[in-house]
From Swiss-Prot:
Pathway: Amino-acid biosynthesis; L-arginine biosynthesis; L-arginine from L-ornithine and carbamoyl phosphate: step 3/3. It is found in: Cytoplasm. It comes from Neisseria gonorrhoeae (strain ATCC 700825 / FA 1090). Keywords: Amino-acid biosynthesis, Arginine biosynthesis, Cytoplasm, Lyase. The gene is argH. This is Argininosuccinate lyase. Belongs to the lyase 1 family. Argininosuccinate lyase subfamily. It catalyses: 2-(N(omega)-L-arginino)succinate = fumarate + L-arginine.
Amino acid sequence: MHDKTWSGRFNEPVSELVKQYTASIGFDQRLAEWDIQGSLAHAQMLTRSGVLSENDLTDIRRGMSEILEEIRSGKIEWPLDLEDVHMNIERRLTDKIGDAGKRLHTGRSRNDQVATDIRLWLRDQITVIQNLIQNLQTALLDLAEQNAEAVMPGFTHLQVAQPVSFGHHMLAYVEMLGRDFERMTDCRKRVNRMPLGAAALAGTTYPIQREITAELLGFEQICQNSLDAVSDRDFAIEFTAAASLVMVHLSRLSEELILWMSPRFGFIDIADRFCTGSSIMPQKKNPDVPELVRGKSGRVIGHLIGLITLMKSQPLAYNKDNQEDKEPLFDTADTLIDTLRIYADMMRGVTVKPGNMRAAVMQGFATATDLADYLVKKGMPFRDAHEVVAQAVRHADEAGVDLSELPLEALQGFSKLISDDVYGVLTPEGSLNARNHLGGTAPEQVRLQVKRWREMSA
């Protein structure tokens, strides 16, 4: 008997170097449980279609149950000579149950088999990821609710722009993660299409009933073109793109946490368990976790580019190139899952420093726009108000004080429209409360948005 299922065509064995270079068992063995799921459904369909006997099905189920137990207990071996997870499991099954194991592959190719395995695996990973996204959102919502009144500088160009609520800032990331959740839901629709039954590329001559297999495996749709079914990796690229966006959002938050934790900002502190020290500088507390998230985002984005490049020049249908889809896909899911898990825990360990944040607001003329709006409401055209306030800011800057610290006489020197009610406008808290509309930064709006998100995820 040949050591490979296809070696009867060849006059010489494959070299050891080629075996090592082309084998995928080192990484695709993680698909084993999903491969068994697909095989059991395929066997049941073949039995109902009259291709396999009931005895064959009974033997296959028994053998697969034993193999699954070996996999979960770590007792199974994965010989390199058998190339991949599919051939390893088939050989193990045949060793256990004999000819019924050889019949299992009837009407099926590894091409549609592996495409099915990946989709089954990825479908489960998306479920895990979506649960973790919601868990992180909950951590951010808790922070937002606790700090709805905490005022901080909002930035544009990393320069102080206007006062915002820290809670409002956290809600911005809740919104981003909400879109990420939606993208995963949308991606799952295209992942959840069954290629099994396409065989190598043209379908099969056996009387298969793909609807039965799809129902058994929980696929909502069936791939309608056999060529496309075995060669499509759009779903993998789409998932990696969605995962890249999640990592981009977490990288942006990481950058802010790193800045805010630095003494130059001093807005927050991160719990010790997420930081490390220095081997030479005793005073150091380094935000390693957010820094590493920032770095790992590039890794996931790199996988996206790799998968796109992998597919760009392939003719129909299946090509060996596609073996290279698994490692970037696996690593993308692993990295994202690990990052989401640690991030939710880390955000629950963030300590906010409202006093430092408010002091920073007072150093950047953050209420200048509020003064301009004040003058507009008194009847001054906005462009004129903009110019007047710019002059007032320059004067305050030269005097080394905030706008709210200028005496009334000085402010009236820029416009007689200004009266003593202006000081209610120039405080950071007044600025927050004035923006009390849908999407605004007022504490009342922050609480309403927190409530809305909690109700949506309940």
